[in-house]
A protein has these predicted regions:
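Extracytoplasmic
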Residues: 29-191, 210, 290, 745-751
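N-terminal secretory signal peptides and thylakoid transit peptides that target proteins
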Residues: 1-16
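Active-site cleft segment of glycoside hydrolase catalytic domains centered on the general acid/base Glu
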Residues: 377-471, 475-494, 521-539, 569-571
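C-terminal beta-strand-rich structural cap/linker in extracellular carbohydrate-active enzymes
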Residues: 649-687
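Carbohydrate-binding surface patches
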Residues: 95, 601-636, 641-642, 664
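Aromatic-lined carbohydrate-recognition surfaces of secreted/lumenal glycan-active proteins
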Residues: 432-457, 503-517, 550-561
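Aromatic/acidic polysaccharide-binding cleft in carbohydrate-active enzymes
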Residues: 516, 522-584, 600-602
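N-terminal substrate-binding region of glycoside hydrolase catalytic domains
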Residues: 290-394, 408, 414
Length: 805
């Protein structure tokens, strides 16, 4: 069984691993400095942002922007004058709203842009971990680290600007709350960043391309600033070192050429020439193989991005390019339904549509996930689903019309903290799937990403949802306590066996979340040891998932992501590639179309191997072992976990915890990649959806993040009134005959005729009284099934669980 991400983090299973973690290097600060300069948000010399009074604000007021109106050409802005007692570098902090959710508030704001002394505006494009780790201030405001500025002595002008909207609970808007900001003098200048690759990249480049290291100071030096640097590869071997000097003048950067390096992931440590190693700034870069990953439908690899929340607007294009260069063919993303449809039928999707267009422009196929419904669409009894499933149909049709490659009908409905039931969710899935299917050239329909096999999924499948889908989906994570070498969870095998039992083994299975939990402290990236474990696990999980029959794997997650003491991203908090990024690039390029052939036989004890066809006339064996062993590989070309080719041919290879790729040419034609699975066209009877509704007082128990134990059914009295909604998602009126099929000891009496005419795109409601006889055992789940026919054809049933409370 695979653990799910929400339950594992809720359980706090990661605390035992924290003591072993190291810290990233910190930068020294001067001990003597002038007093901090604090400016109230409402003290702007020019602004078009409203000022709001609030006694909690430090000056009794603050700037408060919350507008759906597009800004004027100068943006929503506030300009301030600041008197600096001396020239130099100043750290900038602000009490304001963060652009992402934090542990202490769900309030978010637009990404800020800054301009100093009428210079160009620059977005504060920090990653989610920086914002997430901010300390609380008051209300929805946090104490934000906005980086460093170089001020001149005397008067300076500082302008904050908003030009991009953000997603709020009630819709998309331009938002900012600014109470005050503070500038603190830094002593001297220091090295602030080291990166590689060309401009507009996330420190990546292709093997064979010329590349430089770029070193950046946080200000202009008064004297020549001499720095030293060292570059080590994934295996800890030093591959480059040297010195560079930034001369006084207009420049704050210097470049140093890199030698011709093999594909891999590299760690750079740089510091002032006379500083200690503990003061070094650390950067990462990736040299990618010249062999590109497979594109189009043949690509089996995806990554979770959630770009609106995790990727600053100015980084979006470079991020998308980095994911494609890593070999991902798909991205999994989604927008908040409440923001996309703030009122019935009024859609506001342009913000998210721009993200999707950017991803597609870089060759990535979007998998769009439907979020919980807006508040206006829900009732206390329907939460988190719309009470009227026609809203689900129309919203899904709208999403499909924006041309994602696939639409996933929800995310982990089995492990939320509501009382929603699997039968209600199945009715929602049918309605949403019909909305997708009824669009021209529809995208693939993907079943909800189930967190864990169990009662919820079993009941949802009993409601015959598979016939509405092109793809079966699930998630799986290893035990969070396994920090050293996590084992791939059994979720893939469980789901394969479940699909086979249902006769649905021909439906492609996608693992739309797979990843691992790595415990971190605030302000700290993964340690080098953790980075290696993450890289190894990514390869093993992708390989074992494909070997278990998965058609596609989505890693969680691509962007930098820190959540409740756990780090998930393939990029560092500086948006630079970690070793797992390079491991993914090697995997996707070498496996190609990744046609699974079978396990590798004849290996020594402790060694594991799986064979794939690349689609290029090659056999690719992926091998690893708990302890180093020698394995014969006559006539093969060997690549390491980073994609580096072995220097010379050898009859044997040492296999260890780091996977290796053994590639040999094969005779015959490459295996053809199958066309995407498409379900048959849905019949008029399948366009009829039955949905059981019960009063809130009869709600099922709360799912408690999936930890609730049976009985899980609606809690009924001896006599309970309930309703059955009959939806007709066709374009003509339909006459439907309904029948109730209660379990033994129960009866269901219709209060209305059970033959009903349902208008096109309409709903009719039938009332029933459900009665339990004296022999019914309390607190035990029983099935209650409603069936129907349309012109003699069976309508997919609605099957619930009920219990006598």
């Amino acid at each position: 069984m695979g653990l799910n991400r929400r339950t594992a983090m809720k359980a706090g299973l990661l605390t035992t691993a924290m003591s072993a973690l190291g810290l990233n290097s910190a930068h020294p600060q001067g001990t003597s400095a002038p007093p901090p300069i604090t400016v109230q948000g409402e003290a702007a010399v020019r602004t078009n942002i409203p000022v709001v009074r609030d006694r909690r604000a430090s000056g009794g007021s603050y700037l408060a922007l919350n507008s759906k109106k597009k800004p004027p050409k100068e943006g929503w802005y506030a300009t301030y004058t600041v008197q600096a007692p001396e020239a130099g570098v100043y750290a900038l902090t602000a009490v304001a709203t963060a652009p992402v959710e934090t542990p202490h508030t769900e309030a978010t704001a637009s990404y800020l842009q800054l301009a100093l002394n009428n210079g160009q505006f620059v977005e504060i494009a920090r990653s989610q971990p920086y914002w997430y780790e901010s300390k609380p201030a008051w209300g929805g405001l946090s104490v934000l680290d906005l980086g460093e500025l170089e001020l001149r002595r005397g008067e300076n002008t500082l302008t904050f600007r908003v030009t991009e909207p953000t997603v709020l609970e009630t819709g998309t808007a331009y938002a900012l709350a600014l109470d005050r900001f503070t500038l603190r003098r830094r002593e001297g200048v220091r090295l602030s960043e080291v990166r590689a690759g060309g401009d507009g990249t996330l420190s990546t480049y292709r093997h064979g391309e010329p590349a430089n290291l770029t070193f950046t100071l946080n200000g202009h030096p008064d004297h020549p600033y001499r720095l030293r640097y060292a570059v080590v590869d994934y295996f800890g071997e030093r591959v480059a070192e040297g010195y560079a000097t930034i001369e006084p003048g207009d420049e704050t950067t210097v470049k140093a050429p890199l030698p011709q390096l093999p594909p891999g992931n590299y760690r750079v440590a740089a510091s002032a020439a006379d500083a200690s190693d503990t003061e070094a700034v650390v950067g990462h870069f990736a040299c990618l193989s010249a062999l590109l990953a497979t594109s189009g439908d043949a690509n089996r690899f995806g990554v979770n991005v959630w770009a609106t929340s995790l990727v600053p607007p100015s980084r979006l294009s470079a991020f998308a390019a980095a994911m494609r260069d890593m070999g991902a063919g798909w991205i999994r993303d989604g927008q908040a339904w409440p923001a996309a449809e703030p009122s019935p039928g009024a859609y506001d999707t342009e913000h998210h549509d721009r993200v999707t267009r950017t991803m597609r422009r870089h060759g990535l196929s979007p998998l769009e996930v439907i979020s919980p419904a807006p508040e206006w669409a829900m009732t206390a009894a329907s939460l988190p689903l719309p009470a009227d499933l026609r809203h689900a149909y129309r919203y899904a049709r709208r999403l499909a019309s924006r041309h994602p490659a696939a639409v996933q009908l929800s995310n982990e409905p089995d492990v939320d903290v509501t009382s929603s039931t699997a039968d209600a969710h199945a009715a929602f899935v049918k309605a949403a799937a019909l909305g997708v299917a009824d669009t021209p050239d529809p995208p693939l329909v993907v079943l909800p990403g189930i967190a864990q096999a169990g009662h919820f999924q079993d009941l949802m499948l009993a409601n015959d949802v598979v016939r509405y889908a092109d793809v079966w989906a699930f998630h799986g994570y290893p035990d969070p306590a396994e920090q050293d070498e996590p084992a791939f969870p059994g979720a893939a095998d469980e789901q394969r066996e479940l699909a086979e039992r249902l006769g649905a083994d021909d439906v492609p299975r996608w693992m739309t979340e797979c990843g691992a939990f790595f415990a971190v402290r605030p302000g700290v990236d993964l340690t080098p040891a953790q980075q290696a474990v993450q890289a190894r696990y990514l390869v093993r999980s992708m390989v074992e998932g494909l070997a278990a029959g998965n058609a596609r794997q989505f890693w969680f997650a691509g962007p930098p992501l820190h959540d409740d003491g756990v780090y998930f991203g393939l990029l560092s908090r500086e948006f630079q590639p970690l070793p797992a990024y390079s491991a993914c690039a090697a995997l996707t390029s070498l496996l190609g179309e990744a046609h699974f052939v079978g396990p590798v036989s004849g290996l020594p004890a402790g060694a594991v191997g799986f064979e794939f066809g690349s689609g290029r006339g090659e056999s690719v064996r992926v091998l690893w072992a708990a302890k180093p062993v020698r394995i014969p590989v006559p006539g093969a070309t060997v690549y390491d976990v980073m994609g580096r080719r072995a220097a010379s041919a050898s009859a044997e290879v040492t296999v260890s915890r780091d996977p290796v790729y053994v590639v040999t040419a094969t005779a015959g034609h490459p295996e053809a990649h199958p066309a995407p699975h498409r379900r048959p066209s849905l019949s008029p009877a399948e366009h009829i959806v039955l949905s059981q509704r019960y009063p809130a007082r009869n709600a099922a128990p709360n799912k408690d993040n999936g930890d609730a134990e049976p009985p899980l059914g609606y809690r009924l009295s001896r006599r309970t009134r309930m309703s059955l909604d009959v939806y007709n998602f066709t374009s003509t009126s339909r006459t439907v005959t309904v029948r109730a099929r209660p379990a033994e000891g129960w009866s269901a009496r219709a209060e209305d005729p059970t033959r009903v005419e349902v208008p096109p795109q309409g709903r009719m409601t039938l009332d029933f009284t459900i009665t339990a006889t004296s022999g019914v055992k309390r607190r035990t789940d029983h099935r209650l099934e409603f069936t129907a026919t349309l012109d003699g054809e069976k309508v997919p049933a609605s099957v619930s669980l009920v219990q006598l409370k």
